[in-house]
Amino acid sequence: MANLKEEFAGLRGVKGGALEDSGTEYDPTKINLTLYGTDKLYTLAIIKRAVSQVGGSQTNKALGILCAFVTSENNPDMTDAAVKLLVDMRFKVDVVPVDDRLGDNLDDPNSKLAEVLTEENMVDLVKGLLFTCALMVKYDVDKMATYCQQKLERLANSQGLNELTLISTSRAVLARIGAAVRPGQKLTKAIYGIILINLMDPATAARAKALCAMRLSGTGMTMVGLFNQASKNLGAPPADLLEDLCMKSIIDSARRIVKLMRIVADVEDMTAKYAIMMSRMLGDGYFKSYGINENSRITCILMNINEQYDEGTTGGLAGVRVSPPFRKLATEIARLLVKKYDGNGSAGPGASDLVRQAEQAAQETEGEDDKYDEEGEEDGGEGEGGEDEEYY
């Protein structure tokens, strides 16, 4: 643990150049985006049919049709313009034909949304649907359902697209969308290409930012903010807090985030900034390098620390997936860290001692903590990898 201080201090020297991890190059020229192309003119009836089948057995084909439609908007010249825009951002672009042969008598899980489509609103609503589907790259089914039920209405209404609240929140439907929109898939790259195109257009940028661009920040940005706030609240040196959290991997995450922020800060052109952020999201190393389970656990601890100074902070834990036993343990670790530092950075027990004390306190109060079990059920119960012997 002693080396953690040296490693964290080394973040000051992180530059915009490449690190040892090839997945952190953030270079648009290494990313192949996909655009679906078609010579057909899509009627309202065809688009309604495709929308209704998103989340059903023909999800991939339906999303392909919708991607081709919003890319061209029934004008082949629009597809050429979209390709040029992305190439100018230094991405490689593959234009692939779309398979628009939808079968008959199929399930229609999003028929309610399809019913409200008109000639006037179908482009905007299809974009909104695709932007929402893009969140499945980062959200699991339970978190996506929570998003649709609690946040989508506010965002959709703010953009004049209140019809988006008709998107099905069935777990089975969302699971099929999630299976289609996975990292590295052509559909995923096509949707992210559409996001970029809309971010670059002043007429659509605000809507794209509101409905989907928040995912460009990624979990790392949130982690850095939580960590900084907890460090300030405790009056604890960052290196000491890292040691107490027993999370060496957070240093690697911090290095990647610091590097990304340095690169983005050095670029003046907004188009180039978005290209760098998107290359991070689509790079092969992104989903391999992030310890999502550990991030969830450390987020749980940090929020419990900040709750001691700003009541209501732990309300953000509703979407954080950790096991109920770990929630209890995180509360005790946070309490002991507050006691250790007492706002002035004073010395106290080491990391292993803190964890042992927290485990003991958590066991002693086991009968008083049914509320943690209830919270765990609300956000999906045990988190990924949340076995009892893997609390930390």
Swiss-Prot record:
Region of interest called Disordered, as start-end residue ranges on this chain: 345-392
GO cellular component: helical viral capsid; host cell cytoplasm; ribonucleoprotein complex; viral nucleocapsid
Ranges of Acidic residues composition bias in the record: 365-392
Highest taxon, organism lineage: Viruses
Compartment(s) of residence: Virion; Host cytoplasm
Keywords, ordered alphabetically: Capsid protein, Helical capsid protein, Host cytoplasm, Phosphoprotein, Ribonucleoprotein, RNA-binding, Viral nucleoprotein, Virion
Keyword Repressor: no
GO molecular function, one term: RNA binding
Similarity annotation: Belongs to the novirhabdovirus nucleocapsid protein family.
Function noted in UniProt: Encapsidates the genome, protecting it from nucleases. If expressed without protein P it binds non-specifically RNA and therefore can bind it's own mRNA. Interaction with protein P abolishes any non-specific RNA binding, and prevents phosphorylation. The soluble N-P complex encapsidates specifically the genomic RNA, with protein N protecting the genome like a pearl necklace. The encapsidated genomic RNA is termed the nucleocapsid (NC) and serves as template for viral transcription and replication. Protein N binds protein P in the NC through a different interaction, and can be phosphorylated.
Subunit structure of this chain's protein: Homomultimerizes to form the nucleocapsid. Binds to viral genomic RNA.
Protein known as: Nucleoprotein
Organism: Hirame rhabdovirus (strain Korea/CA 9703/1997) (HIRRV)
Gene: N
